Curated annotation (Swiss-Prot):
Its main location: secreted. It comes from Naja oxiana (Central Asian cobra). Belongs to the venom metalloproteinase (M12B) family. P-III subfamily. P-IIId sub-subfamily. It is an enzyme of class 3 (hydrolase). Keywords: Cell adhesion impairing toxin, Complement system impairing toxin, Disulfide bond, Glycoprotein, Hydrolase, Metal-binding, Metalloprotease, Protease, Secreted, Toxin, Zinc. Binds 1 zinc ion per subunit. Negative results: does not show proteolytic activity on rabbit IgG, human C3 and C4 complement components, fibrinogen, beta-casein, hemoglobin, ferritin, myoglobin, chymotrypsinogen, and melittin. Heterotrimer; disulfide-linked. The heterotrimer consists of 1 metalloproteinase chain and 2 lectin chains. This is Zinc metalloproteinase oxiagin.
Amino acid sequence: TNTPEQQCYLQAKCYIEFYVVV
C-alpha cells in the first residue's frame, strides 16, 4: 500500500512542494 506521501516523496516536483510546506 503506497501512501500519497510516499509517492510524493519519490517525485521531485512534489518533493519541492513538500519542502516548502515544512
